[in-house]
Amino acid sequence: MSVNIKPLEDRIVVKPLDAEQTTASGLVIPDTAKEKPQEGEVLAIGPGRIDDNGNRVPLDVTVGDKVIYSKYGGTEVKYAGEEYLILSARDVLAVVS
């Protein structure tokens, strides 16, 4: 999936994965009780931040990676009818392989 959003510095555009709709026992979870997703797919990355010496610091993630991110990190945006999350690289906790 390609998105026409180009993040700046060390920011990352993530498409959150859908939250679970049912429990393991088959109970349907209403929207009001669902947890905010913390996993998503990286759709775009910025060029990286510039350190104190003027060197560009590359990001640890690449487009297509599945990541786990901080529960309350990032900014939710809606673009072209889709919902995305723009995160700082520091909000990404792990890459899922």
Curated annotation (Swiss-Prot):
Signal peptide: none annotated. GO terms for cellular component: cytoplasm. PROSITE patterns: CHAPERONINS_CPN10. It comes from the Bacteria. GO terms for biological process: chaperone cofactor-dependent protein refolding. The keyword Chaperone applies. It is found in: Cytoplasm. Keywords: Chaperone, Cytoplasm. GO terms for molecular function: ATP binding; metal ion binding; protein folding chaperone; protein-folding chaperone binding; unfolded protein binding. HAMAP family: CH10. Heptamer of 7 subunits arranged in a ring. Interacts with the chaperonin GroEL. Belongs to the GroES chaperonin family. Together with the chaperonin GroEL, plays an essential role in assisting protein folding. The GroEL-GroES system forms a nano-cage that allows encapsulation of the non-native substrate proteins and provides a physical environment optimized to promote and accelerate protein folding. GroES binds to the apical surface of the GroEL ring, thereby capping the opening of the GroEL channel. PANTHER family: 10 KDA HEAT SHOCK PROTEIN, CO-CHAPERONIN GROES. This is Co-chaperonin GroES. The lineage of its organism: Bacteria, Bacillati, Actinomycetota, Actinomycetes, Propionibacteriales.
